[in-house]
Amino acid sequence: MIPSAESPARAIATQDADSPRRLTGPLTVFFATAVGVIVMNLFAAQTLTGAISRSLHLAPEFAGLAAMLPQLGYAVGLVLLVPLCDLLENRRLIVRTLVLGAGFLAIAMLTQSRVLFLIAVFLAGAASSVIQMLVPMAASMAPESHRGRAVGNVMSGLMLGILLSRPAASLIAGSVGWRAFYGLAAVINALLAIVLYVKLPVRMPLNPTRYPALLYSLWTLLRTEPVLQRNAASAALVMGGFSAFWTAISLRLVQPPFSFDMKGIALFALAGAAGAVVTPLAGRAGDRGWDRKSLLAGHLTMLIALVAIGVAGAGWGGFSASAHPVLAVAMLVAGAAALDAGVVTDQTLGRRAINLMDAAARGRLNGLFVGVFFVGGASGAAMSGAAWAIAGWSGVCVVGFVFTALAFVLRLIR
């Protein structure tokens, strides 16, 4: 997800209260690292659902909430918190939001209450929308001629964080328990807040707009822009299928004949992340005018992958994972990589279409695109948990297939 260089609330005008600071190479790396670390708050729980649900005694149908609520919180934060960049001094807003996020992660680590845990991860997800405050800040520190490149470099950390979040969380949980991951995340987020307070310039909005007007403008764009509607809906549906798989895969891998421990799940997640290599290919396809063909190919690849995943994990077509465990694992890994590739393709081309729209509204359009995207992911995660409780791995694969098939049909008819 590579947002524009503008605030997701709107294209804002700001000024430095301090002397201007340039986005140097080391500072770019720092911003990318910060974004990558923060986004881990949203995706790490996908491979921890089994451990969390057992520890907090979550019913099987509610296991997916641990993965769903951070993403839902992020979407809420995009709508309610990020527009504050147009009203409040940016550095103070960023630092305070990150400190609050660290506090919520600490609560998630310490609490024995499943209700309080779920509330804490939801609020931590909302605070993680600070990512969309950091990106325009970084862009404003770059020369205008290099702004797009600067944003791309910073946001490369986002995809890296998403890809590494699942294996990192699994490795930490496998070594010292799932609570340690949330504790470590809380400490790192707090340290980031301190460093950002030192590194960021003070930036005040030049033309602050009333908060209700900002929120209403988001609704107007969502209601009136068909390109946004089409691409956001497609991204949300694809992310729903993707999240359904990753939310439940750890529950399946701990069962026979796989019987993976947390370290095994971490290696699986790392291998499955190989599909992200298609990112530059998708971008080039869009530049050559192959958007629709590439999107349909990506969605079709995901549908085939979900069938293969059903064969390997649920015995569709009479396949026996017990008789062919190595082949079953290989099919699951290949399917995971194909799902990653499909999501990245849809997201890259959808983002490209959004950024070709009205430049004056680009920030808001990007914010809405990302927000709808995460609502889709949260929905897939929630439905995955219910499907697992009702029909096991077959149910999960069906949920993922339905989400992806709807995206495929949407691209066929529009």
Locate the predicted segments by residue.
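Juxtamembrane intracellular "pre-TM" segments in multi-pass secondary transporters
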Residues: 12-22, 200-232
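Conserved MFS/SLC helix-loop-helix module at the cytosolic interface between two early adjacent transmembrane helices
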Residues: 76-114
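Structural signature of the two symmetry-related core transmembrane helices
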Residues: 93-106, 186, 293-308, 401
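Cytoplasmic helix-loop-helix junction between adjacent transmembrane helices
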Residues: 121-157
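Intracellular juxtamembrane helix-capping segments at the cytosolic ends
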Residues: 130-142, 344-358
